[in-house]
């Protein structure tokens, strides 16, 4: 999934597998998705990977993006791990404005600290069609990433 704003901020996210791909107990094996990505802002670009979403949380990303694209004004999307948060911050001449907060293991290397609550925020002005396409891509990549994780058994 790729979100690219008109002002240059960007975020690429994908499910890259499971945290515990070799666990014998399927409840443990399929409990956490590994999320990897790249982010870019005026300050620079960086990569990250962490077990940031439970398998139950992962589908909420595409549902939230679709709700935002429909301008339903969804509430901020937060997760059990505080690495990632999506907020709808209004609109501008380009389209909707998303704010994506990246915290803890998703922070850029020049802004890392050992506590939560001081995220790096990407501002992404993006059209509704691009949000729908990102939601579709997330669903497809999530299924592929999960299948890749199962293949390692």
Q: PLM features: residue spans?
A:
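Short glycine-rich, low-complexity/disordered patches
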Residues: 67-86, 143-153
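Short amphipathic beta-strand/extended segments with alternating polar/hydrophobic composition
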Residues: 14-15, 44-55, 110-126
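A structural detector for beta-sheet-dominated domains
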Residues: 4-6, 14-16, 40, 56, ...
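N-terminal domain-start interaction segment
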Residues: 1-47
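Short, well-structured hydrophobic secondary-structure segments
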Residues: 30-73
């Amino acid at each position: 999934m790729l979100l690219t704003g008109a002002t240059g901020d960007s975020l690429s996210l994908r499910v890259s597998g499971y945290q515990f791909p070799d666990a014998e107990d399927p409840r443990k094996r399929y409990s956490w998705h590994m999320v990897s990505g790249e982010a870019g802002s005026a300050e620079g670009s960086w990569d990250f990977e962490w077990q940031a979403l439970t398998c139950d949380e992962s589908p909420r990303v595409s549902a939230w993006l679709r709700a935002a694209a429909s301008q339903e004004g969804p509430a901020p999307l937060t997760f059990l791990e505080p690495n990632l948060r999506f907020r709808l911050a209004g609109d501008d001449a380009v389209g909707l404005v998303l704010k994506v907060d990246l915290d803890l293991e998703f922070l850029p290397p020049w802004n890392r600290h050992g506590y939560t609550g001081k995220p790096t925020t990407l501002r992404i002005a993006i059209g509704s069609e691009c949000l729908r396409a990102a939601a579709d891509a997330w669903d497809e990549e999530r299924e592929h990433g999960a299948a890749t994780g199962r293949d390692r058994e």
